[in-house]
């Protein structure tokens, strides 16, 4: 898989925003993210440019994605950061030690992407062959070989707990995320309306301390086998 490098220089940001406004046919963007931090452009320059767009009325709020604690603090010192988007789920819990405390301290909303483990935590994927030949997930370590088998065992236990709770595995996974903090707003992706409704049902799932402890025992930090991204990333 080929991944394009992030760009955060002023010229690129301004060009991208203008193009987005034209494409969407709107006067402003509610929340504009810098998706991945550009290693070649100081974060202060990137956020400073985004702040100018706020003053111009083209952008209302600024967000970052996959930024580390130092970058978050430096960015927030230039202009208030409204949201940080980073992967977080029952099988990707790396943010808990350093990222979540910082965003909570600074009053920044946290937006977990891939809250359902790229679909794995839904219980709908039972074998590698369930993934279409052109599916990007085939390149991800957690969906390959022995990692897949081990992760399937983890999901099986989540499915059992969800069945006892009377909800879908996806709803249990999302409810767990929502229980981690009031500033957390997960963004599960889907192409189907019935899945949207199912995901929204997570708002009606309340987890007790005992249930949260049970989930913790099933999927503690580091429980997932394999890395988050392909080695090329």
Predicted features and spans:
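Glycine-rich beta-alpha junction loops
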Residues: 68, 88-92, 114-121, 176, ...
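Short, hinge-like loop/turn segments at secondary-structure boundaries
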Residues: 6, 78-82, 100-104, 126-131, ...
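Aromatic-lined glycan-binding groove of carbohydrate-active enzymes
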Residues: 95-133, 168
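Glycine/proline-rich, positively charged
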Residues: 1-94, 98
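Conserved, mostly hydrophobic/aromatic
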Residues: 20, 29, 42, 62, ...
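Glycine-enriched alpha-helix->loop->beta-strand junction motifs that scaffold or abut catalytic
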Residues: 76-83, 104-111, 182-184
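Proline-centered loop/turn at the N-terminus of a beta-strand
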Residues: 60-61, 109, 168, 185
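Terminal-tail/helix-coil boundary detector
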Residues: 105, 133-164, 179, 183-184, ...
């Amino acid at each position: 898989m080929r991944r394009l490098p992030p760009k955060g220089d002023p010229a690129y940001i301004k060009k991208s925003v203008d193009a987005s406004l034209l494409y969407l046919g709107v006067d402003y963007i509610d929340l504009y993210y810098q998706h991945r931090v550009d290693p070649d452009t100081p974060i202060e320059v990137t956020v400073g440019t985004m702040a100018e767009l706020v003053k111009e009325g083209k952008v209302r709020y600024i967000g970052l994605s996959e930024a580390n604690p130092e970058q978050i603090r430096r960015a927030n010192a230039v202009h208030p950061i409204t949201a940080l988007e980073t992967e977080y789920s029952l099988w990707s819990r790396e943010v808990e030690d350093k990222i979540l405390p910082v965003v909570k301290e600074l009053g920044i909303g946290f937006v977990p992407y891939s809250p359902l483990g790229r679909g794995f935590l839904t219980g709908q994927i039972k074998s590698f062959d369930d993934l279409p030949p052109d599916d990007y997930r085939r390149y991800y370590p957690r969906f390959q070989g022995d990692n897949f088998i081990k992760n399937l065992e983890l999901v099986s236990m989540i499915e059992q707990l969800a069945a006892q709770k009377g909800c879908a595995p996806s709803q249990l996974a999302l409810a767990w995320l929502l229980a981690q903090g009031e500033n957390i707003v997960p963004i599960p992706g889907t192409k189907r309306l019935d899945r949207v409704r199912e995901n929204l049902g997570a708002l009606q799932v309340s987890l007790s301390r005992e249930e949260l402890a049970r989930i913790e025992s099933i999927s503690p930090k580091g429980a997932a086998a394999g890395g988050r991204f392909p080695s090329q990333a």
